[in-house]
Design a protein with these regions (language model features):
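Structured catalytic-domain cores with a bias toward divalent-metal coordination
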Residues: 1-189
Length: 189
């Protein structure tokens, strides 16, 4: 989520989405502060699905604990994507010294998406010590997570993103999904 609109504005000027975001942010801050008061580790797993078809992946900020968590979850990790998003929650949390990762589970209505998100949580719970490393649910989740992305490298670095203006009428050609190899000069849209 983009936290930037909340900065410097009075709550009474918020849109309904901003009010919801402000309430969520307030809850996260309160939980984080309560955990810190007990000297507990703070970890955020931000679960998402997309409108587009494609494989699951993790997004992490530039933080070693966050990257370790994302790698343990077992999905491809995309480095640099969080830098293209304005004001993401995970970047803010990591700047506060906490651990955070996004799990992008897949397309909204795809049956596998819920499984990926659930399995990612099982592995994350084990990673932070809430569940034992060899819990049956965690073992099963690790196998399923890794099998869902066999043909994709474990870590990818986003080096270029072409911004598309909504006014251009841009339309991708059918048949493409994330992580598909593209040859130089090959038509995409």
């Amino acid at each position: 989520e983009n936290l930037q609109p909340l900065g410097g504005r009075a709550p009474e000027d918020d849109t309904s989405d901003e009010r919801e975001l402000r309430a969520l942010f307030s809850t996260i801050e309160a939980e984080r502060d309560a955990a810190r008061a007990k000297a507990q580790r703070v970890v955020l797993i931000d679960l998402h699905s997309t409108s587009a078809d494609g494989g699951a992946f993790s997004v992490v900020p530039d933080s070693i604990p966050s990257r370790r968590l994302a790698r343990d979850i077992g999905l491809p990790v995309i480095l640099g994507l969080e830098e293209r998003i304005e004001g993401p929650l995970l970047t803010w949390l990591v700047s506060q010294g906490d651990t955070a990762t996004v799990i992008e589970g897949g397309q909204h209505d795809a049956p596998r998406t819920q499984e990926v998100l659930r399995d990612g949580l099982w592995v994350a719970l084990s990673h932070v010590g809430v569940l034992p490393e060899h819990d049956e649910r965690v073992d099963r989740a690790r196998v399923l997570m890794r099998s869902s992305c066999d043909d994709v490298p474990g870590v990818l670095d986003l080096v270029y993103a072409h911004v598309i203006d909504g006014e251009t009428g841009f339309q991708m050609d059918s048949g493409w999904s994330n992580f598909m190899p593209v040859a130089l000069g090959q038509r995409l849209a």
